[in-house]
Design a protein with these regions (language model features):
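Structural preference for alpha-helix termini/caps and helix-kink/transition segments
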Residues: 82, 90-250
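Alpha-helical recognition segments enriched in aromatics with Gly/Pro capping
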Residues: 1-145
């Protein structure tokens, strides 16, 4: 609450001697008019003592909850070592975007649960790029298939239709489970696998129910974009961007 002044430091006079307010009380003072906060974020290293002190101070002063939800992120690591300026192993966003598209960086970050540490390496970014390529290739091929004029009344296998119907709920459930973006992306790839299976089967691909599934797939991609900020670009244009980016790195 109160830091005693050391020689040469700024200070205020108080009943407890010369000093200044502590770091923790600053946050409580600034946030007081807005309590309770909907979401309070920060790194895991701030849980103790900073956030615990914020809670103690704010709840004692205001007789109300400080925050409804706490979001504590894990650390970015480089080759399994914490990224930090002191170690000289940090990368800026500008550095990364010299070699990768912004969407690839976003995909990489969302591929891990936000509370987990994430290891930044060139290999992990390359894997994120390959995964993006799989999704956009499926979107592109689905669009090409839908451009055909003739469709037959060929039903989807029941197990495929049932699995397809359950996947959006699984996607939503993942995000509702402490914003588990990694699990949500897993549901995206489950849908990509079904679409690829459909596209590889000429009989299913030509069916009206197959057409409906492909149309639904493209619509779901727009929903993923709203929720995650991914997969909303024109597939053909994005695949061309990926190729250009890879060529620049080569």
């Amino acid at each position: 609450l109160w830091k005693a002044a050391k020689p040469g430091e700024p200070f205020w006079e108080s009943p407890w001697g010369k000093g200044r307010l502590g770091w923790h009380i600053e946050c409580s003072a600034m946030s007081q008019p807005y309590l309770p906060l909907d979401i309070h974020g920060g790194g895991q290293d701030l849980i103790f003592p900073h956030h615990e002190n914020e809670i103690a101070q704010s709840e004692a002063a205001c007789a109300c909850s400080l925050a409804r939800y706490w979001v504590h992120n894990g650390f970015v690591q480089v080759n399994a070592e914490k990224m930090s300026k002191s170690l000289g192993n940090f990368k800026t966003i500008r550095d990364i975007l010299e070699n990768y598209l912004p969407e690839t960086l976003r995909f990489f970050l969302l591929g891990k649960h936000y509370r987990s540490p994430i290891d930044f390496t060139a290999d992990s970014m390359d894997e994120a790029e390959k995964a993006q390529h799989r999704v956009f290739t499926a979107l592109h091929e689905a669009g090409k298939a839908l451009a055909r004029d003739k469709w037959k009344k060929t039903p989807l296998p029941q197990e495929m239709a049932e699995e397809w119907a359950t996947l959006p709920k699984a996607f939503d459930a993942a995000l509702e489970d402490d914003i588990n973006t990694a699990q949500a992306l897993g549901q995206v790839f489950a849908q990509v696998r079904l679409v690829n299976r459909l596209l590889e089967d000429k009989g299913l691909r030509a069916g009206e129910t197959g057409r409906d599934l492909l149309q639904d797939f493209l619509a779901r991609a727009q929903e993923w974009n709203k929720r995650l900020g991914l997969f909303g670009q024109d597939p053909q244009a994005f695949l061309a961007e990926l190729r250009s980016q890879r060529a620049r790195r080569a």
